[in-house]
Each structure stands twice: as C-alpha cells, then as structure tokens.
Amino acid sequence: MTDIAASASQPALVRNELNLVWLDMEMTGLDPDNDRIIEIAVVVTNSTLDIAVEGPVFAIHQSDETLAKMDDWNKSTHGRSGLIDRVRASTVTEAQAAAQLQAFLADYVSPGKSPMCGNSICQDRRFMARWMPEFERFFHYRNLDVSTLKELCRRWQPAIYKGFQKRAMHTALADIHESIDELKYYREHFLIPAAPASAA
C-alpha cells in the first residue's frame, strides 16, 4: 500500500468518518452466482478527494476450470493485462483478501460510515455480497456511484460528457484512480454551484 498524496506540504490521511472508500474488482464475468472475483483493490480519500491512500491490491486465486469459463472479451482483456497469470500464481482466497482489506480500512474509517465508491459500483457490491459478505457489511448501505453523474452528464451536458476520456485499463487500482479523477472532472465542469442571488 502506498500513500500517494502525502508530502511535506500535504498531511497524510487521518481517520475521519467522512473519508471515502473507493473500490474496484475485476471478475470472470457479470453474474455473481456463476462468476468469481479475480482482483480487488481499495483507495481511501478524504471527503474532498485531495488526499488518497492506496490499500493492498490482491489477485484472487481461481481454478483453471473457472478461468476457462470466461468469455472471449474477459480472456483477452485479462490476459493482455497479465491478470490471468497473476490469478494463477496467487494463493490468496476471497476470505483472506477481504480480511486484510477490512483491517486496512479500519485505520481510516469506522464500519458502516463510508458508502461504497466507484463506477458501476452496484455490480462490485453484488459480487461482494456473494463472495465477501462480511466485508460488504463494513460499508454503509449507500453507494457513491460516479456512473450516475456520467449518465446524467451524457443526457444533460453531452459536450462536457465527451470531455473526459477513460483509458479503460481494466485493472482494479487503475480503474479506481480513474473513477476519482472522473468525479473531480464532474465536480469542476458539471456540478457547478449556482451564482448567489443579487441583493434586491
């Protein structure tokens, strides 16, 4: 894990109930009842997204039989990124990864306080509820889904929507940082406070 934002001029992230926990998973498919988690990462930020700390990144071991069931897109994407090889070499189970991630997060936020933050995060939550249920309960029941702003921006401000280009690396940690950057972009360009009314 790495503190990616602390510097001599910027303090390290401190424990606070308003801190945000960002999460991303890579899976073998989209169905939590038949597919499995193959990578998971977390990043914790302060509420204004100015300070961030990376947590552990885990490739989750899955059997060759499970990996063989992936469709062509997943085989190509995760093969090209090297994730399939990392999954085969890993000895980490879902339960082990969940326990270590929860222990890491406990240093920065109390259970039940942070929403689960990310892009299309409801999908990650479905897999977590199926394969890491105790870890899923660490989060507040609410989600902070950047995809909501994306879809609103696409409909209401299409020019602004087109201004953020994703790299689509499809690795968990890179996708988290991209989600944080995307939310910062919408905050600057889309979530613009109204000008105060002039005095009568």
Swiss-Prot record:
GO terms for molecular function: 3'-5'-RNA exonuclease activity; nucleic acid binding. SMART domains: EXOIII. It comes from the Bacteria. The keyword Cytoplasm applies. 3'-to-5' exoribonuclease specific for small oligoribonucleotides. It holds the Pfam family RNase_T. Keywords: Cytoplasm, Exonuclease, Hydrolase, Nuclease. This is Oligoribonuclease. Gene3D superfamilies: Ribonuclease H-like superfamily/Ribonuclease H.
